[in-house]
Every structure is written in structure tokens, then in C-alpha cells.
């Protein structure tokens, strides 16, 4: 309920970020999803975009379901996060692009986790390469609206090669 009240006071065309775990997803995943679904619906009605922070890959399918429900062919209202420090993130991003019949909302994050954990890149150089590949893939694909969550100069220079209306 608090999230809906916050959406009511922020200007339309703003973005509201949330996390599944903030809604008790570990205890009640279905209840958390229902609450986020309600917030996404309210946000769309008010013109406020919803960014779902992918603190855990367990929620990717649920995020995709919300994008399918609220995103249109021309505009993304719900965005999910792709953690490019994960070795499988590029494959997941490409799969989502291929199966999306709507405008995919992609928030690209580089991430701080590197190495010594299964499924993560071992070096920052590998993470940078994956992030820059994701920049190229998303910004060159018509049905993707991209948020570049980075301050990395190389990635930002790379993004400037594309039309500004394809990223934020």
C-alpha cells in the first residue's frame, strides 16, 4: 500500500524501483508477486515505470511475466535487471529478446561480484566485455528499451553510437 501511495505522489514518466525481497518473497513468493503485480498495474495507470531490481535470479520468470502483462509493443512500463557479472546473463537476455512480443525493459548492471563463486565471471575484464556486448545487443534491437546502469566511460561512449531514444 505504501508503494502505491508513493507512486501517487511522484510525477508521471518517473521510475519507481523495487525488490521482490522487500515484499517478503522468501516467505511468500506468490504473495510478493501479487503485490508487485498490483503496483505495476497502478504504476502503468499513473504513467510511472517500474524497475524490478534483480537481486536474485529466482524472479526472472516472474519479471518477464509482468513485462508481458504491462509492456506494449511501443513502450516498456516494467523493467527487469540483467546482472552482467553472471556468466549466463547474456544468454538469458538474448532469450528474453527472442521471446518478447512486446517492448522488453532491460536494466543492464555490471555488478560488483567477480570470481570465486559458481556462475560468475572471474575477472572484471570479462564482466566489462559482457556488459559492452549487452549494450550492443540491446541498443541495436528495436523491441528493447534499455537502462544503462553504469558510469564506465567505455560503455557510455559505446552507447552514444546508437539513437538516444533506445536507452536511458
Per-segment meaning from a language model:
Residues 1-168:
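Positively charged, amphipathic and often flexible ligand-engagement surfaces
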